A protein has these predicted regions:
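Short, surface-exposed loop or secondary-structure junction motifs
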Residues: 2-233
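Structural recognition of the beta-strand scaffold that forms the well-ordered cores
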Residues: 6-9, 118, 245-246, 254-258
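Short beta-strand segments enriched in hydrophobic/aromatic residues
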Residues: 92, 179, 249, 258-259
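Short acidic/glycine-enriched loop/turn segments that link adjacent beta-strands
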Residues: 207, 239-241
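Short, surface-exposed beta-strand/loop micro-motifs that present aromatic residues
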Residues: 234, 241-254
């Protein structure tokens, strides 16, 4: 079996990702297969992946089955994997009895005051408040706006451990200020200081990673996600769509970059 620690460190031997969306397209035309997608939400087709594009409800289970049956990679190797965080999100749901978005909203975002943060922003904001993500000409064939960029996360109802979270710089600064404060913000405690220290410290013999967090590269021969001006106490995470959040306890500094 897989160890949670190895999954958090991206050294659980899972593949980086599995491209499931291509299986749902019509061969030759690369357009949505009408057996899998409907232009309207209806019984059996309620998973919205874009405008006028609702996926069959059984496909998330198919995707999880693909992950579960995928071959494992080499031992003692660091490979960043979307599948790691997809599984972690499912573990949170299984333990809490809540969907991942419900759990995060209830225990963190609402209490902290992160009112612009959450999954599926179309359900909470007017269209004029949303920024277009991309012009998708390979899967959804439209301008994607208010729907997650990642195809797999879209197929998981827009809620997944590896992608789908929308936010802004102010909200993210609140979250990371709570972490810098040792788990407390505005008189409310969310996490124990020792928990934050454990997760944001170097935890691997084969990579620079913390538990879930990225860290500065200590090996001068390897590329680092940050410049040399930040301390080894610092931690954060980058995002595929051009995002980065980083905190340095030694300088009490938070850096948020959302492109």
């Amino acid at each position: 079996g897989l160890k949670i620690q190895d999954v958090l460190l991206h050294q659980a031997r899972l593949s980086p990702f599995i491209v499931c969306y291509k299986e749902t397209l019509t061969p030759g035309t690369n357009t949505p297969n009408p057996a899998i997608y409907s232009e309207k939400s209806k019984p059996g087709f309620t998973i919205r992946v874009a405008d006028k594009m609702y996926m069959r409800d059984d496909w998330p289970d198919t995707m999880l089955d693909r992950i579960a049956k995928s071959p494992l990679g080499a031992k003692n190797k660091y490979v960043y994997s979307d599948n790691d965080f997809i599984l972690l999100g499912k573990i949170v749901e299984a333990i809490s009895g809540l969907t991942l978005d419900q759990f995060a909203q209830k225990n963190f975002y609402n209490k902290i005051g992160m009112y612009s943060t959450g999954f599926n922003p179309r359900n909470r904001f007017q269209a004029e408040c949303l920024v277009p993500t991309e012009t998708d000409n390979y899967f959804r064939h439209q301008t994607v706006m208010g729907d997650v960029h990642d195809e797999g996360a879209a197929m998981f109802r827009g809620v997944s451990g590896h992608a789908g979270l929308f936010s802004n710089a102010y909200d993210l600064s609140l979250l990371y200020q709570m972490l810098l404060n040792g788990g407390e913000l505005n008189g409310e405690r969310y996490l124990k200081p020792e928990t934050i220290k454990l997760f944001t410290s170097y935890n691997s013999d084969i990579s620079r990673r913390g538990l879930g967090f990225d860290k500065p590269e200590m090996n001068p021969d390897k590329d680092s996600p940050v410049c040399g001006c930040v301390s080894y106490l610092s931690f954060g995470h980058t995002g595929f769509t051009g995002t980065l959040v980083w905190a340095d306890p030694s300088k009490q500094l938070i850096y948020v970059f959302l492109s």
